[in-house]
Design a protein with these regions (language model features):
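Alpha-solenoid helical repeat scaffolds
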Residues: 44-45, 75-79, 113-118, 165-169, ...
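TPR/TPR-like (Sel1-like) alpha-helical repeat modules
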Residues: 100-102, 144-150, 191, 197, ...
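N-terminal leader/linker segments that initiate helical-solenoid repeat arrays
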Residues: 2-7, 13, 17-87, 94, ...
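Short coil loop/turn residues that delineate tetratricopeptide repeat
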Residues: 72, 106-113, 162, 195-202, ...
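Short coil/turn linkers that connect adjacent helices within long alpha-helical scaffolds
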Residues: 33, 67, 157, 228, ...
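Eukaryotic tandem repeat interaction scaffolds
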Residues: 189-227
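Terminal, low-structured helical/coil segments at or just beyond the last alpha-helical repeat
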Residues: 28-34, 201, 213-215, 219-222, ...
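Short coil/linker segments at helix-helix boundaries
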Residues: 29-30, 50, 54, 81-114, ...
C-alpha cells in the first residue's frame, strides 16, 4: 500500500500548530473542559471545521472570517500556516508563522503557557520553511530552531505539565520523532497524547497514525475507531480507517474500499490534494477502476 506522506505531513503540521462536541457550541475552549482560555469563537469554528468535521474548504473560508476580528490569536495563524503548507505555499506559511510568533510574544505575562506553546509552534514552522525551501542539506541550519521548540515546550510544561493543548502538540512532536528515529520507543512517544491531550478526535487520530506507520494495524484500528466515535462525520478519519483495513488485508479489503468510497461522498469539502490521493488509493484497491463519488 502506498503511504500518503505528503498529506499526512500536512495534517500533522496542522495539528501540531494548533473539542467541542457540536458545531453550534463555540463558547468552550476546544482543548480544555476546565480553566478554559479565551480563544476567539471564529477561530474555534475554523478549528472544529478543519479537525472535527474534516471540512477543509469551509475551514479555509472560516479562517478568512476569523482574521478580521481575532487577529491576535496565535492558533488562528497556526491554522493558516497549515493551509499554506498543504498547498505548498511555503512563503505564505512562513509569513503566517511570523504572526504566530508575534501573537505568542504578546501573550507573555497574560497566558505564559500558551505563549510558550505557540513560540514552539512558530519555531517549528520556521524550521519547516528552511527545510522545504532549501532542501535537506539545510537541516543543520534548522537545528537551533528545533532545539528552541523543545526549550519552549519545556517552559510550558513547567507551568502545567498536564495541559491538554500543550500535550496535544507535544504528543504529535514526540510521535514524529519516534517515526524518524528507529530506536525511539513508540509507547513512550505516545504517552503525552494518551494521558493528557484533547480533543479526542485529534488525540486518537494521532495515535492511529503512529500505529499505522509502525505497521500495527490492530492498534491503529482501535485508535481510529475512537477518533471516529468523537468525530463521526469526518471523511479524513473514514479514509484513515480504510487505509488501516487495507493494511490488514484479506477479508478486510472490501470493507477498506467501502471506507474509501464513503470518504469520497464528501469530496466537495476535502483538501484538493487529499481528494486526489483518496481517488488514487480507491482506484488502486479496485484494480484500476475509478470509484463512485
Amino acid at each position: 500500500m502506498k503511504r500518503p506522506l505528503k498529506l499526512i505531513s500536512a495534517s500533522l503540521l496542522a495539528a501540531l500548530v494548533s473539542a467541542v462536541t457540536a458545531i453550534p457550541s463555540f463558547a468552550a475552549d476546544p482543548f480544555r473542559s476546565t480553566n478554559p482560555r479565551d480563544i476567539g469563537s471564529e477561530t474555534q469554528k475554523a478549528f472544529v471545521l478543519m479537525f472535527k468535521e474534516g471540512n477543509y474548504v469551509a475551514a479555509v473560508k472560516q479562517l478568512d472570517v476569523a482574521v478580521k476580528t481575532e487577529a491576535n490569536e496565535p492558533l488562528l495563524f497556526a491554522l493558516r500556516a497549515s493551509t499554506f503548507y498543504a498547498k505548498e505555499d511555503y512563503l505564505g506559511m512562513r509569513v503566517a508563522g511570523q504572526r504566530v510568533r508575534a501573537n505568542a510574544q504578546a501573550l507573555k505575562g497574560k497566558d505564559n503557557l500558551r505563549a510558550y506553546v505557540y513560540l514552539a509552534a512558530s519555531d517549528l514552522i520556521e524550521a519547516g520553511y528552511i527545510v522545504k525551501t532549501e532542501g535537506v542539506s539545510s537541516a543543520a541550519r534548522a537545528l537551533p530552531l528545533v532545539q528552541s521548540v523543545f526549550d519552549n515546550i519545556k517552559q510550558a510544561q513547567d507551568i502545567d505539565p498536564i495541559d491538554p493543548e500543550l500535550n496535544l502538540i507535544k504528543g504529535y512532536i514526540d510521535m514524529l520523532i519516534a517515526s524518524v528515529l528507529p530506536l525511539s520507543d513508540l509507547e513512550t512517544a505516545l504517552s503525552s497524547l494518551k494521558q493528557y491531550a484533547a480533543p479526542d478526535y485529534l488525540k486518537w487520530r494521532g495515535i492511529a497514525l503512529a500505529y499505522r506507520d509502525a505497521r500495527k494495524p490492530e492498534l491503529a484500528l482501535d485508535a481510529v475507531n475512537k477518533a471516529i466515535a468523537a468525530a463521526p462525520n469526518n471523511p479524513e478519519l473514514t479514509y484513515l480507517k480504510g487505509q488501516v483495513l487495507w493494511m490488514q488485508g484479506g477479508n478486510n479489503i472490501p470493507t477498506a474500499k467501502k471506507q474509501f468510497e464513503l470518504a469520497l461522498t464528501k469530496a466537495k469539502q476535502l483538501n484538493p490534494s487529499l481528494l486526489t490521493e483518496i481517488r488514487e488509493q480507491c482506484r488502486n484497491i479496485s484494480g484500476g477502476v475509478s470509484c463512485a463519488e
